[in-house]
């Protein structure tokens, strides 16, 4: 179900995790008016009938936490404007997505390491788009880590908060017509943020990290990392001053996505 997240796949995974034949029988529970029951109704039904209840999201989180799903495939020296780093390429065994870790200095003790989990943004990271703060955050994170003398950047292939490059460009079209970044994703049929940080946590653990200081403004990212056994130290904020092109974007991240940004 890590390739396709659905109830059918979840039934098969539950059987497999129980050590049984990977097959299952599913049914849809209806409300009295004939509509499909949703989570609140299903939780009540389960409680009334003494049935164990879990969500698809909980099953995904369990697998990400307990199964190793990424492995390193290549490693090389990477000279940059922020010093010389070590770049490690990883492949996801489930969907074959490729991610990288940039390692600066010696992080072998695994303790109190400065870390940035950064989701891919072609427009911001490569073309220096002013619509978002992604490119600025990546550059600033590299500067902070270089000044610290050691740290890690995990660069995840999660373009457009997980919707992909072309869908992100479609979202930009909607933003040009007045939608904000959350509304645009929703109008395209996506949740505001589809990113998952479990793979990033697995990469950090593979590098031997135990406790980290995350460079982020996103509380959801911190919860996502802590849930995989990493100890979190003090958060390091990374706030770009607003300008005409990104002011609305930053307001939306603060007001609708819960990012820790100033008023």
Question: What do these predicted regions represent?
Answer:
Residues 1-263:
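Catalytic domains of riboflavin
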């Amino acid at each position: 179900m890590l390739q396709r997240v659905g109830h059918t796949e979840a039934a098969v995974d539950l059987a497999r995790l129980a050590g049984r034949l990977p097959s299952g029988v599913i049914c849809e529970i209806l409300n009295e008016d004939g509509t499909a029951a949703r989570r609140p109704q299903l939780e009540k039904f389960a409680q009334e009938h003494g049935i164990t209840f879990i969500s698809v999201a909980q099953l995904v989180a369990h697998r990400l936490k307990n199964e190793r799903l990424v492995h390193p495939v290549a490693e090389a020296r990477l000279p940059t404007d922020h010093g010389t780093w070590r770049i490690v390429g990883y492949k996801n065994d489930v969907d074959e997505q490729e991610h990288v870790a940039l390692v600066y200095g010696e992080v072998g003790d695994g303790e109190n390491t400065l870390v940035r989990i950064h989701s891919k943004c072609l427009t911001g990271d490569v073309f220096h788009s002013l619509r978002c703060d992604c490119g600025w955050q990546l550059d600033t994170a590299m500067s902070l880590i270089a000044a610290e003398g050691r740290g890690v950047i995990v660069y995840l292939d999660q373009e457009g908060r997980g919707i992909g490059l072309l869908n992100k460009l479609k979202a930009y079209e909607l933003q040009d017509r007045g939608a904000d970044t959350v509304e645009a994703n929703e109008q395209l049929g996506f949740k505001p943020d589809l990113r998952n940080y479990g793979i990033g946590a697995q990469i950090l653990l593979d590098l031997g990290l135990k406790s980290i200081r995350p460079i982020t403004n996103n509380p959801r990212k911190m919860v996502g990392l802590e849930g995989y056994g990493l100890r979190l130290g003090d958060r390091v904020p990374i706030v770009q001053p607003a300008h005409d092109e990104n002011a609305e974007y930053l307001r939306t991240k603060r007001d609708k996505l819960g990012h820790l940004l100033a008023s």
